Structure formats: structure tokens, C-alpha cells
């Protein structure tokens, strides 16, 4: 029975829902031997590095990927290899004379541990440590031996209609293959373009970067495309890597995608020229504090959101961020000292614009947020409110301060004041309000002082966002939620600020305005649908001349590509993609290349050379051939 698109989509859904400890779902099989999946072309390793996948002009954005159902299927070589390696590892231990670890007879065991300090000390010069504290995520592929892959490709071409339904028979087919020698072909592809032109493609791994591979690539390009071809270069720099940790399960990332073209002779790992365009892609993730210049802003934002969540869902618990927890007696003394200081000052004549010392409610917030539980907050609030009732507080709250505590401070100076009843939710509400006011003023101040953004305009955006949020959230709830897109916009704009030349900071207000509009509009739209906005991404393209390239280009590009094409008239006969990657996403390719990669040690007497660093790259070559209609 022919395979259908519904079967393939159901398999993808089951794989996406599978937990780490769950068994893998039964694959969709071809000839009871090969796994078949439907995947977007943009997810295929090496091909995904193409600057514009649409230029390949394939019949579909999705492709069929064929491989084995599991690793080692169809061959016992994998198991035998593991056994052999294990045996080699234990052989030295069989001879006691070979164990030189305990060099002092009768003495303690002599050991040496590799630390980050030692690693950095050994890396002399400008050498980065790639992949430290990082788990690599590999593409799910169980490759087929190359000879079988070639036969399977021919079989599918001749018998496609017997095994695939019409809905998938027109999709291009990518077969995952492997071979033990270089050049190792890892992908075989075939299909038709959107103009019904037949194409064939192969991705070959040449090995690690060296002069031999470099010369081979240049020679093949000249043969395929001629010596006067236009070279389209691309270099991707990772400014912040997407590394998940226990405390950062949803990390963000920042990449700078640099693209330029030349008609000069191809040079691998060519540096971008000044006419290059840089696409900055920022993904803040969720709860990733690396994007926040001020850690306190990060902590206070998510603490305020937690308070708002507890008010909306009273059964939830307040999670206080302080670690280690503060001593409550010390907090009582801080509150007493604040009351004493407030009894000696009168800020009634201080304007909102010139107020920089911190509102009285800011100072209360900075004390109560260090508590360990709501009961402690209630006791501290009562101490402060009793001082208000006795007329000890002479300080005034700012006019724009809309919190309930600020209203109580104003009332205490003009009429008879009664201490309100503080229960659990009323305490949390009062705490959230002063937290919102404190964070709002801090964020506005950074926007205006560092990013040159008008404070009045930001106040208007905040108020508009608060008003446009669904009324069901409650007034102060909306005020808390409206801080999220504004603070995320601050983190995004700050990252762009660090990537620009100092003289080009004048474009920041316009970029910041675009970020604010995007984040607030997305927040409001999702809130109206009852969803929570947790995706904050921004992308912009700037000329390299505006970028502080000495900063991000001090790191090596994680991906470097060159694209060429050979045309006859208006028809493209071949496309060639040369790709150099520091960390290919195919596990078997990593193992194959690493086995042949040279090992070097940098010392002060012999620092790392450029050729040593370049050997970290894996060189891959993909050629698309388009067969003209006869």
C-alpha cells in the first residue's frame, strides 16, 4: 500500500511529543527496511546553510528523507567497532607495569584535573573555546551505506508510484548515506524543480580544512562554474550561543549573518568586505538573564510577573528570588532606618523629571522584595503603615506613582488615615504595585539615558499597551504584564547597542521604536486570544560599516559558505555550495572527520597558528545538477 502524507505527518507529531525516556514511535517504512520522513528542506544539514533555499527552485519546500529506522540497522559493524575500541581501552590495565598513574611507590595517587583556568592558560593568543559547557544537538539520521543508497535512489526513481501516494510522489527525495573514505557522500538527492526540470544533488564531505582540501574545492568550482563566476559568500557569527542549562531551559541566541559577493578568485574563509550586509538575529528565549545588562531588572521583572500570576491564580505560591535568603531581623532594621530617614526629609517640591534619588515606595520595594515569604512582607508593611498613621513619614510619593501605597502616603498628609487590613492577597497586590512602579521608572530611565529614546513617548507606549490588554486581567495586572514587552525591548536594543559603532548610535531610537512596536503588538494580539507571549525575536539588516566588527568578528564564524552557479543563457545548469562548519549537525560526519583531524597543543613557545585553528572546520561540498528538458 503506498505511503501517504498523513502517515508521515502523524509520525512527526509522535516524535515531537515523545519524552526523553519514552520509546520511539514505530517508523513509516519503505520496503520494510528504510525509514521515510517528510521534513522541511531548511532542516537538512549543510543544505540549510544555503543563503536562500528558494533559489534552488525545488518542487516543494518539504522533502522526503530516507534512512535506516535505527542506528546500526543492516550492519553489525557498529557493534563490532565499539567492542574493539573497548578492548583497546582495557588492554593496558591487564599489565600492572603499564599503569604509571601512581608514580610514587607507597605514596598517594597522583592525579591532574583539567580546569577552565588551565584550558584558557593553554590557549595562547586569541583562541576561543568552542562548545565548552555545551551539548551538541545532532540531526536525527541513521545513514545507509553509500552503495545501497545509490541502488535505492535508482529504485525509487523507477518505482516511485508503487510506494508513494500522489501527494508525496512529487516531493524531492534526500537519502542519508555514509562511506568510510574521503570524499564521503552523506546526502544523495533527486527530484524536480518547480518548472518540472529534473535535478540530482550530492553532498560530499572532504574532511577537515587544509591546503589540499582548499585546492580541491577551488579546482572543482572552476570546473563546474568557470573561473569568472560570481562568488556569493556568507559568514555566520554566534554572539550569544543557544546553550541550555538547568537554570536556563529555554535559552536565547544572537547571530550575525554576513553576506557579500565578489567576482574575484575564490578564497576559502574569506573575510567580509565593507560592502557586506549584516543581518542581526536576536532571540531572547525565555528567562535567559544573559541578555539583561542589569541582573536586578531581570530578577525584578519575573518576580513582578510571578506576583501578578498569584493574584490571578491565588492557589499558586509566591517565589521570592533572593538567594541566599535575607535575615528578617536585618530587614526590620532596614525598614526602621527608612522610617527614621523619611521623618527628616520632605520631597514635596521635587519634580518628577528631576527626581533621581528614588521614590519612597522604591525604597520600601527594595526592602520587602528581599523577604522569604508573604508573612514577612505583611509585617514590614504594617511597620511602615503604622509610621504613616503616627505621622512619622514626611516624604512624598511622585505624582505619577499610581500604586496604592503611594495613595496612602498622600492621604496620610491631608486627612484622617486608617491602616488598611492586610491579608495575603492584599499584601501581594500592594507589593506588586510598588514593584511595577519601581521597575517602570528604572526601565524608562535606561531607555532615555543610554538609548536616547524619549521618555514621554515610552510612557505613552506603556500606557497604550496597558489600556489595550484585555480588561479581564485587572488594572494593575495589566500594568505588570505591559512591562514584559517593554523590558524585553530594552534587552534587545541593548544588544544592538553593543554591536554598533559608537558614531552610529544615532540610529538606535528608530530601531528601538521598531522593536517596541513589534513586541507590544504581539503581546496584545496573543493576550486577546488568551495566550501568553513568550517569544521575543527581532531581526534587522545593517551595512557592515555601521557595525563594531572588531567585536563580533574577533570570533571565528561558526558557518562559512560560498555559493556559485553555472548558467547557459537563462537556464541554470549547476549550483555549488561550499560549506565550512565548526560543528556539523550530523553525528557520523563528526566522528569520521575527527578521526582524521590533526591534534595540536598551543604553548607560550609555540602559539596556535591560523592553519591549526582552520583545521577545526569541516569542509563540505554540495552540487546540484539541473538536467535540461530534451
UniProtKB/Swiss-Prot annotation:
Gene assigned in the entry? zwl-1
UniProt keyword list? Cell cycle, Cell division, Centromere, Chromosome, Cytoplasm, Cytoskeleton, Developmental protein, Kinetochore, Meiosis, Mitosis
Phenotype when the gene is knocked out: RNAi-mediated knockdown results in embryonic lethality. RNAi-mediated knockdown results in defective chromosome segregation, premature spindle pole separation and incorrectly attached kinetochores. In addition, knl-1 localization to the spindle-associated rod-shaped structures but not to kinetochores is lost during anaphase of meiosis I. RNAi-mediated knockdown also results in abolished targeting of the spindly-like protein spdl-1 to the kinetochore.
Record's family? Belongs to the ZWILCH family.
Cite the record's note on assembly. Component of the RZZ complex composed of rod-1, czw-1 and zwl-1. Interacts with the spindly-like protein spdl-1. Interacts with NDC80 complex component ndc-80.
First-listed, main subcellular location of the protein, grouped into a coarse class: cytoplasm
Q: Which PANTHER family match?
A: PROTEIN ZWILCH HOMOLOG
Please list which residues make up the signal peptide: none
Q: Where in the cell is it found?
A: Cytoplasm, Cell cortex; Chromosome, Centromere, Kinetochore; Cytoplasm, Cytoskeleton, Spindle
Q: Which GO terms describe its cellular component?
A: cell cortex; kinetochore; RZZ complex; spindle
Q: Which domain of life is it from?
A: Eukaryota
Q: What is this protein called?
A: Protein zwilch homolog
Q: What does this protein do?
A: Essential component of the mitotic checkpoint, which prevents cells from prematurely exiting mitosis. Required for chromosome segregation, the assembly of the dynein-dynactin and mdf-1-mdf-2 complexes onto kinetochores and spindle pole separation. Its function related to the spindle assembly machinery and kinetochore-microtubule attachments likely depends on its association in the mitotic RZZ complex. The RZZ complex recruits the spindly-like protein spdl-1 to kinetochores.
Annotated GO biological processes are: cell division; meiotic cell cycle; mitotic spindle assembly checkpoint signaling; positive regulation of mitotic spindle pole body separation; positive regulation of protein localization to kinetochore; protein localization to kinetochore; protein localization to kinetochore involved in kinetochore assembly; regulation of attachment of spindle microtubules to kinetochore
